[in-house]
Regions:
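N-terminal secretory signal peptides that target proteins for export/translocation
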Residues: 1-3
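Extracellular modular ligand-binding repeats in secreted and cell-surface proteins
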Residues: 354-438
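A composition-driven surface/loop motif
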Residues: 5-9, 16, 23-359
C-alpha cells in the first residue's frame, strides 16, 4: 500500500511537470541579472543572466539595479507581454538602455505600481526598436512610469538617430523626459516621431533643449499624432514644439479629439506644430477636446512660436494656422495663451463651435471616377477654408443593356464580327469593347 502511494505521488508530480507552463506569471528581480523576454511562435520565454529560458507568458519584473537591463523581443506576428511592477533601473553610467524592445512583432507593457527607468548616452529611457507597436497600459489603474532618456535619447521612443513610431499609451501615469536633443515621446536626435496615440492615462512629456514634448527630436518632425483621451501635458524644449517638430522640424497630421491637453512650445517653438523654422499643418481639434496651447517666447533674434502653426524664424514670429474644428462639439474648446503667460490664467483667445456653425457640406465631385480610375469628392467646412477629400471607387466596365452591333456580315468564305461597347465608351478615356465572331 505504501509503495502504491509513493508511485501515485510520483505519477502526480510527473503529470504536473508535464503540464504547459506558458501561463506562468512569475516575478523576476532585475537585481539578479539582465532579463530577456522572447515571444516566438512557440510561446514566450524569459531568460535571466546565463540561465535557461523559462516559459512565461506574463512575467512581472521587479527590483532595483544600476547594472542590469531588460530586453523585450517579439517575432513578427507575435506580441510580447511584460508587467513592470515597482522596478527601478538606472544604467546611466553603463551607456545602455534600461528597457529596450526588439524584433518585428508587438510589445505590450502593463504598469503596476511606480517604476523608473534611466538610460545612458544615446539611449531612450524606454527604447523602442521593434518594428511593430509598443503599447503601455494600466488595467488596474495603479501604475506609473517615469522614463528618462540619456543624452540624444527620447524618454520613450528612439535612441540617437532613431525614429520613435507606433507608440500607444492607453493608461497609467506616464512621465517621459527626453535627453538633450530628443523628444519626451518620439524621436531621438535626428529622429522623427510618428504614429503616436494617447487614449488614456495621465501623460507628461518634456524636453529641455531642441526636442519636442511629443514628436520629433532635434531636426526631426512629428506626424500622425492622435490624442483621444486622458490628461496630457506636452512641453517642448528650446526651439521645439510642445506637440510636433523638434528643432527645425515640422508638425503635421496632428489630431486632438478628446481629453484634457496642454501643449506649450519651447523658445520659438509652436504649442502644436513646428519647431524653429518648422511648419505646422493638418491640425484637427474635434469632439469634446479641452485644449490649451501656448507658443514659445522669443530667443535672441528669433520670433515667437505660434499657438498652433509654425515655429519662429530669424526676425519673424511663427505663422498661426487655423485648425480644423468642423467636428468640434459644443463642449470642446481651444484656449490660446500668450508666450510666457500662465496657462492657468485667462486665455488670450478661446475658440469653440457652440452652435455647430462649422460643419462639413455634402461635398462635390472634383474628379469624376472612370471605369478604371478612382474619383475624388471634396468636402468644405462651412465658415472656414478647410477641405477634406474621399475617394470615389472606380466604376468598372459595364455592358449592361448594350446590344452587339454587326461590324461586317459573314460571307461564304469569311466569318463576320459583331461588337459590344462599355456603356461609358468614349467617356473618361474608356475604350473597352468586346468583339465576337458572328
Amino acid at each position: 500500500m505504501k509503495k502504491k502511494r509513493i508511485v501515485s505521488t510520483l505519477l502526480a508530480l510527473l503529470l504536473l511537470a508535464s503540464l504547459p507552463v506558458s501561463a506562468l506569471a512569475a516575478e523576476w528581480d532585475i537585481g539578479k541579472g539582465d532579463i530577456t523576454v522572447n515571444a516566438e511562435s512557440g510561446g514566450q520565454t524569459v531568460r535571466q543572466g546565463g540561465g535557461a529560458a523559462v516559459p512565461d507568458s506574463a512575467p512581472v519584473i521587479t527590483g532595483t539595479s544600476k547594472e542590469n537591463n531588460v530586453t523585450i523581443n517579439a517575432e513578427s506576428g507575435q506580441t510580447a507581454s511584460v508587467t513592470l511592477s515597482g522596478v527601478n533601473i538606472d544604467v546611466r553610467d553603463k551607456g545602455k538602455a534600461a528597457v529596450s524592445t526588439t524584433g518585428e512583432g508587438n510589445v505590450s507593457i502593463e504598469l503596476n505600481g511606480g517604476s523608473t527607468l534611466r538610460s545612458g548616452y544615446e539611449h531612450a529611457g524606454l527604447e523602442k526598436n521593434n518594428g511593430g507597436s509598443l503599447t503601455i497600459a494600466d488595467e488596474d489603474k495603479n501604475g506609473k512610469l517615469t522614463a528618462w532618456g540619456g543624452q540624444q535619447g527620447a524618454g520613450i521612443g528612439g535612441g540617437s538617430g532613431k525614429d520613435g513610431s507606433n507608440i500607444f499609451i492607453t493608461g497609467g501615469g506616464v512621465n517621459a523626459i527626453g535627453g538633450l536633443a530628443a523628444a519626451g515621446i518620439g524621436g531621438g536626435l535626428g529622429g522623427n516621431g510618428s504614429n503616436i496615440t494617447i487614449s488614456g492615462g495621465k501623460v507628461g512629456a518634456t524636453n529641455g533643449l531642441n526636442g519636442a514634448g511629443i514628436g520629433g527630436g532635434q531636426h526631426g518632425s512629428g506626424s500622425n499624432i492622435t490624442i483621444s483621451g486622458g490628461e496630457v501635458n506636452a512641453i517642448g524644449g528650446d526651439s521645439s514644439a510642445g506637440i510636433g517638430g523638434g528643432h527645425t522640424g515640422d508638425g503635421s497630421d496632428i489630431t486632438i479629439s478628446g481629453g484634457e491637453v496642454s501643449a506649450s512650445g519651447g523658445k520659438s517653438g509652436a504649442g502644436i506644430g513646428g519647431g524653429v523654422y518648422g511648419k505646422g499643418e493638418g491640425i484637427t481639434v474635434s469632439g469634446n477636446a479641452q485644449l490649451k496651447v501656448r507658443g514659445g517666447r522669443v530667443q535672441g533674434d528669433y520670433g515667437t512660436g505660434a499657438g498652433i502653426g509654425g515655429g519662429g524664424s530669424y526676425g519673424t514670429d511663427g505663422a498661426e494656422v487655423e485648425p480644423d474644428i468642423c467636428a468640434l462639439n459644443p463642449g470642446g474648446k481651444i484656449e490660446y495663451y500668450a508666450p510666457r503667460s500662465s496657462m492657468s490664467g485667462t486665455p488670450n483667445k478661446t475658440v469653440t463651435n457652440p452652435t455647430g456653425d462649422f460643419v462639413w457640406d455634402s461635398g462635390r465631385v472634383t474628379k469624376p471616377a472612370t471605369c478604371t480610375e478612382k474619383g475624388v469628392r471634396t468636402y468644405t467646412c462651412t465658415g472656414s477654408t478647410h477641405t477634406r477629400t474621399e475617394d470615389i471607387p472606380a466604376l468598372n466596365h459595364s455592358f449592361a443593356g448594350q446590344a452587339y452591333v454587326s461590324d461586317n456580315n459573314a460571307t461564304c468564305e469569311q466569318d463576320g464580327t459583331k461588337t459590344i461597347r462599355c456603356v461609358r465608351y468614349g467617356r473618361g478615356g474608356c475604350t473597352e469593347k468586346d468583339t465576337v465572331v458572328d
